[in-house]
Regions:
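Iron-associated oxidoreductase/ferritin-like identity signal
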Residues: 1-172
Length: 172
């Protein structure tokens, strides 16, 4: 059985991951409305990955005899006017998620909950990758986004991204 505080934080993280999926689906909708199907594809896959993260956390709680407590998912803002605003909001959100994961990790460390720390290692590594990807998207957009041909090529590159389920889900 997990410590109550860890269980509460993990349940909250499930909700944050589901909100992330909801947010990225909103980004995908906006980008698709703008004719940027490649960018939309990239965020649609991000949404799928965030849902996977929620399921991985859910499975961990269940495996440790903790009741999963889902909460309301707030509607994400849809006020983004430019692609760069969306990309920047994506990076800011990933930084928020990283801080949340780090907080849970810190609590697990303080409680000497090594099992949870080991489990969270996956998420710590994942967040490094997520922040790098978000930064790379911003850099590529800045480099190519103002040129129609460059934007076309970048959009096509992003359209080729394919969803691969997390090994943490397929291993269960």
């Amino acid at each position: 059985m997990l410590n109550e505080k860890i269980a509460k934080l993990m349940n909250e993280q499930i909700n944050k991951e589901l909100y992330s999926a909801y947010l990225y689906l909103e980004f995908a909708n906006k980008l698709e409305d703008d004719g940027l199907n490649g960018f939309a594809n990239w965020y649609f896959i991000q949404a799928q990955e965030e849902k996977d993260h929620a399921l991985i956390l859910r499975n961990y709680l269940i495996d440790n005899s903790v009741k999963v407590a889902l909460d309301t998912i707030n509607k994400p803002t849809d006020s983004f006017k430019t692609v760069e605003e969306i990309l920047r909001a994506g990076l800011a959100h990933e930084e928020f998620i990283s801080a949340s994961i780090n907080n849970i990790y810190g609590e697990a460390f303080a409680l000497k909950d090594f099992k949870t720390m080991q489990f969270l290692d996956y998420f710590v590594k994942e967040q490094v990758e997520e922040e790098k990807n978000a930064n790379d998207m911003i850099s590529k957009y800045r480099l190519f986004g103002s040129d129609p041909k460059g934007l076309y090529m970048l959009n096509n590159e992003l359209a080729s991204r394919v969803y691969t389920p997390s090994s943490m889900l397929t291993a269960k």
